[in-house]
Design a protein with these regions (language model features):
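A short coil-to-beta-strand element that immediately follows conserved catalytic motifs
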Residues: 25, 119-126
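Conserved Nudix-box catalytic region and its N-terminal flanking loop in Nudix hydrolases
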Residues: 4-10, 65-110, 152, 159-161, ...
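Acidic, metal-coordinating catalytic segment for phosphate/diphosphate chemistry
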Residues: 28-67, 71-72
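A short, N-terminal "cap"/entry segment at the start of jelly-roll beta-barrel domains
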Residues: 12-36
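Active-site-adjacent beta-strand/loop module that shapes the phosphate/pyrophosphate-binding cleft
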Residues: 44-49, 132-152
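Conserved hydrophobic/aromatic beta-strand scaffold that supports enzyme active sites
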Residues: 40-44, 67, 77, 142-144, ...
Protein backbone atom coordinates (compact mmCIF):
# COMPACT_ATOMS: atom_id res chain seq x y z
CA UNK A 1 0.00 0.00 0.00
CA UNK A 2 1.37 3.40 -0.98
CA UNK A 3 2.03 5.81 1.88
CA UNK A 4 1.83 9.54 1.25
CA UNK A 5 3.68 12.14 3.30
CA UNK A 6 1.46 14.98 4.47
CA UNK A 7 2.92 18.46 4.15
CA UNK A 8 3.18 19.62 7.80
CA UNK A 9 2.16 23.11 6.71
CA UNK A 10 -1.35 21.77 6.09
CA UNK A 11 -1.54 19.17 8.82
CA UNK A 12 -4.43 20.78 10.72
CA UNK A 13 -7.62 18.72 11.10
CA UNK A 14 -9.50 18.24 7.84
CA UNK A 15 -12.76 19.44 9.38
CA UNK A 16 -11.23 22.89 9.87
CA UNK A 17 -10.40 23.45 6.19
CA UNK A 18 -12.49 25.98 4.27
CA UNK A 19 -12.18 28.58 1.54
CA UNK A 20 -11.35 31.94 3.12
CA UNK A 21 -11.32 35.55 1.87
CA UNK A 22 -7.96 37.36 1.77
CA UNK A 23 -7.13 41.00 1.19
CA UNK A 24 -3.94 41.10 -0.84
CA UNK A 25 -2.88 44.62 -1.73
CA UNK A 26 -4.02 45.71 -5.20
CA UNK A 27 -1.28 48.01 -6.49
CA UNK A 28 -3.00 49.00 -9.72
CA UNK A 29 -6.45 48.41 -11.22
CA UNK A 30 -7.50 49.27 -14.77
CA UNK A 31 -10.77 48.77 -16.62
CA UNK A 32 -9.84 47.32 -19.99
CA UNK A 33 -13.38 47.06 -21.29
CA UNK A 34 -16.80 48.13 -20.02
CA UNK A 35 -19.32 45.68 -21.41
CA UNK A 36 -23.08 45.53 -21.58
CA UNK A 37 -23.32 42.74 -19.00
CA UNK A 38 -19.85 42.63 -17.36
CA UNK A 39 -16.48 44.35 -17.48
CA UNK A 40 -12.88 43.26 -18.02
CA UNK A 41 -10.23 44.43 -15.56
CA UNK A 42 -6.46 44.21 -15.27
CA UNK A 43 -4.96 44.41 -11.78
CA UNK A 44 -1.50 44.19 -10.23
CA UNK A 45 -1.64 42.44 -6.86
CA UNK A 46 0.93 41.69 -4.17
CA UNK A 47 1.13 38.00 -3.28
CA UNK A 48 2.67 38.61 0.14
CA UNK A 49 6.06 37.03 -0.57
CA UNK A 50 7.63 39.95 -2.38
CA UNK A 51 6.00 39.10 -5.69
CA UNK A 52 3.66 41.34 -7.64
CA UNK A 53 1.69 39.80 -10.50
CA UNK A 54 -0.80 41.17 -13.01
CA UNK A 55 -4.08 39.35 -13.54
CA UNK A 56 -6.96 39.99 -15.91
CA UNK A 57 -10.49 38.96 -14.95
CA UNK A 58 -14.15 39.46 -15.74
CA UNK A 59 -15.85 41.71 -13.19
CA UNK A 60 -19.23 40.01 -12.86
CA UNK A 61 -22.43 40.99 -11.07
CA UNK A 62 -22.90 37.50 -9.65
CA UNK A 63 -25.90 35.29 -10.26
CA UNK A 64 -28.51 33.01 -8.75
CA UNK A 65 -29.98 29.75 -9.98
CA UNK A 66 -33.04 27.79 -8.92
CA UNK A 67 -33.34 24.02 -8.89
CA UNK A 68 -37.13 23.69 -8.87
CA UNK A 69 -38.20 20.24 -7.62
CA UNK A 70 -41.81 19.09 -7.83
CA UNK A 71 -43.65 16.59 -5.64
CA UNK A 72 -42.67 13.74 -7.97
CA UNK A 73 -38.93 14.42 -7.51
CA UNK A 74 -38.64 15.99 -10.96
CA UNK A 75 -36.38 18.91 -11.78
CA UNK A 76 -37.39 21.79 -14.04
CA UNK A 77 -34.98 22.32 -16.95
CA UNK A 78 -35.01 25.04 -19.59
CA UNK A 79 -33.25 24.82 -22.96
CA UNK A 80 -31.39 28.00 -23.80
CA UNK A 81 -28.87 29.18 -26.39
CA UNK A 82 -25.49 30.16 -24.91
CA UNK A 83 -23.49 32.06 -27.51
CA UNK A 84 -19.97 32.00 -25.94
CA UNK A 85 -19.91 28.20 -26.27
CA UNK A 86 -22.25 28.02 -29.28
CA UNK A 87 -24.53 25.48 -27.63
CA UNK A 88 -28.14 24.87 -26.68
CA UNK A 89 -27.94 23.89 -23.03
CA UNK A 90 -30.45 22.32 -20.65
CA UNK A 91 -30.21 24.19 -17.38
CA UNK A 92 -32.15 25.28 -14.30
CA UNK A 93 -33.67 28.72 -13.96
CA UNK A 94 -30.91 31.31 -13.52
CA UNK A 95 -30.26 35.02 -13.74
CA UNK A 96 -27.90 37.86 -12.91
CA UNK A 97 -27.82 39.73 -9.63
CA UNK A 98 -28.05 43.00 -11.52
CA UNK A 99 -30.84 44.79 -9.64
CA UNK A 100 -29.67 47.18 -6.93
CA UNK A 101 -30.93 46.44 -3.40
CA UNK A 102 -32.49 43.13 -4.48
CA UNK A 103 -31.55 40.21 -2.24
CA UNK A 104 -30.29 36.99 -3.85
CA UNK A 105 -33.40 35.17 -2.65
CA UNK A 106 -35.68 37.83 -4.14
CA UNK A 107 -33.73 37.68 -7.38
CA UNK A 108 -34.14 33.92 -7.50
CA UNK A 109 -37.90 34.20 -6.97
CA UNK A 110 -38.12 36.82 -9.71
CA UNK A 111 -36.22 34.60 -12.15
CA UNK A 112 -38.45 31.62 -11.32
CA UNK A 113 -41.50 33.66 -12.31
CA UNK A 114 -39.89 35.23 -15.38
CA UNK A 115 -38.42 32.05 -16.87
CA UNK A 116 -40.84 29.37 -15.69
CA UNK A 117 -44.02 31.11 -14.56
CA UNK A 118 -43.76 29.46 -11.13
CA UNK A 119 -43.72 30.46 -7.48
CA UNK A 120 -42.44 28.36 -4.57
CA UNK A 121 -43.54 28.23 -0.94
CA UNK A 122 -40.41 26.44 0.30
CA UNK A 123 -36.87 27.70 -0.28
CA UNK A 124 -33.46 26.46 0.85
CA UNK A 125 -29.88 27.22 -0.08
CA UNK A 126 -28.70 24.27 -2.17
CA UNK A 127 -25.06 25.12 -2.93
CA UNK A 128 -22.72 28.07 -3.51
CA UNK A 129 -19.85 28.14 -5.98
CA UNK A 130 -17.61 30.31 -8.15
CA UNK A 131 -17.90 29.45 -11.84
CA UNK A 132 -14.32 30.23 -12.91
CA UNK A 133 -12.36 31.84 -10.05
CA UNK A 134 -9.15 31.95 -12.07
CA UNK A 135 -10.67 34.43 -14.52
CA UNK A 136 -14.01 35.73 -13.26
CA UNK A 137 -15.43 37.23 -10.07
CA UNK A 138 -18.79 35.51 -10.67
CA UNK A 139 -20.31 33.92 -7.59
CA UNK A 140 -23.45 31.82 -7.83
CA UNK A 141 -25.93 30.72 -5.21
CA UNK A 142 -28.27 27.88 -6.13
CA UNK A 143 -31.56 27.56 -4.32
CA UNK A 144 -33.77 24.53 -3.96
CA UNK A 145 -37.38 25.58 -4.57
CA UNK A 146 -40.23 23.23 -3.62
CA UNK A 147 -44.00 23.35 -3.06
CA UNK A 148 -44.41 24.88 -6.50
CA UNK A 149 -47.47 26.46 -8.08
CA UNK A 150 -48.29 28.57 -11.12
CA UNK A 151 -47.54 32.26 -10.84
CA UNK A 152 -50.43 34.70 -11.25
CA UNK A 153 -50.47 35.63 -14.90
CA UNK A 154 -48.61 32.49 -15.94
CA UNK A 155 -45.27 32.38 -17.72
CA UNK A 156 -44.19 35.75 -19.20
CA UNK A 157 -43.07 36.03 -22.81
CA UNK A 158 -39.31 36.60 -22.89
CA UNK A 159 -37.10 38.28 -25.45
CA UNK A 160 -33.82 37.45 -27.18
CA UNK A 161 -32.40 34.11 -26.04
CA UNK A 162 -35.17 33.94 -23.41
CA UNK A 163 -38.04 33.94 -25.91
CA UNK A 164 -40.06 30.71 -26.16
CA UNK A 165 -37.69 28.68 -23.99
CA UNK A 166 -38.54 24.94 -24.11
CA UNK A 167 -39.25 23.52 -20.66
CA UNK A 168 -39.20 19.94 -19.36
CA UNK A 169 -39.52 18.13 -16.04
CA UNK A 170 -36.89 15.42 -15.55
CA UNK A 171 -36.61 12.93 -12.66
CA UNK A 172 -33.64 13.83 -10.45
CA UNK A 173 -32.09 10.37 -10.85
CA UNK A 174 -32.26 10.62 -14.64
CA UNK A 175 -30.76 14.10 -14.51
CA UNK A 176 -27.82 12.83 -12.45
CA UNK A 177 -27.28 9.98 -14.92
CA UNK A 178 -27.14 12.46 -17.81
CA UNK A 179 -24.69 14.67 -15.94
CA UNK A 180 -22.39 11.73 -15.20
CA UNK A 181 -22.64 10.60 -18.84
CA UNK A 182 -21.50 14.04 -20.02
CA UNK A 183 -24.79 14.74 -21.79
CA UNK A 184 -25.50 17.85 -19.69
CA UNK A 185 -22.56 20.18 -19.10
CA UNK A 186 -23.95 23.53 -17.93
CA UNK A 187 -22.29 24.27 -14.54
CA UNK A 188 -25.56 25.03 -12.75
CA UNK A 189 -27.05 21.79 -14.08
CA UNK A 190 -24.05 19.70 -13.07
CA UNK A 191 -23.56 21.32 -9.67
CA UNK A 192 -27.25 21.53 -8.85
CA UNK A 193 -27.99 17.91 -9.78
CA UNK A 194 -25.11 16.49 -7.74
CA UNK A 195 -25.83 18.77 -4.78
CA UNK A 196 -29.51 17.81 -4.80
CA UNK A 197 -28.60 14.12 -4.93
CA UNK A 198 -26.23 14.51 -1.98
CA UNK A 199 -28.82 16.40 0.07
CA UNK A 200 -31.53 13.86 -0.76
CA UNK A 201 -29.22 11.02 0.30
CA UNK A 202 -29.00 12.74 3.69
CA UNK A 203 -32.76 13.10 3.95
CA UNK A 204 -32.52 16.81 3.06
CA UNK A 205 -31.21 17.47 6.59
CA UNK A 206 -28.04 19.09 5.24
CA UNK A 207 -29.89 21.89 3.43
CA UNK A 208 -29.06 25.40 4.62
CA UNK A 209 -31.67 28.11 5.22
CA UNK A 210 -32.55 30.37 2.31
CA UNK A 211 -30.92 33.24 4.23
CA UNK A 212 -27.67 31.37 4.94
CA UNK A 213 -24.50 33.46 5.05
CA UNK A 214 -22.71 33.85 1.72
CA UNK A 215 -19.18 34.97 2.65
CA UNK A 216 -17.68 34.56 -0.83
CA UNK A 217 -20.30 36.84 -2.36
CA UNK A 218 -19.92 39.40 0.41
CA UNK A 219 -16.14 39.46 -0.02
CA UNK A 220 -16.31 39.87 -3.80
CA UNK A 221 -18.73 42.79 -3.46
CA UNK A 222 -17.00 44.46 -0.51
CA UNK A 223 -13.58 44.24 -2.18
CA UNK A 224 -14.87 45.89 -5.35
CA UNK A 225 -14.37 42.86 -7.59
CA UNK A 226 -18.03 42.64 -8.57
CA UNK A 227 -19.51 44.74 -11.35
CA UNK A 228 -21.70 47.41 -9.81
CA UNK A 229 -25.41 46.70 -9.80
CA UNK A 230 -27.78 49.16 -11.46
Amino acid sequence: MTSFVIDPTWAEPLHSLRDTPVNNVVVDSREIHAGVVWDLRSESVELGDGQTVRREFVAHTGAVSVLALDDDDRVLLIRQYRHPVGMMLWEPVAGLLDVADESPRAGAARELVEEAGLVADEWHTLVDFETSPGGSSETIRMYLARQLSAAPGGRPVGSGEERDLPLVWMPLDQLVDKVLAGEFTCPTTVTGALAALAHRNQGWRSLRPETAAWPARNHVVDSGRSRQQV
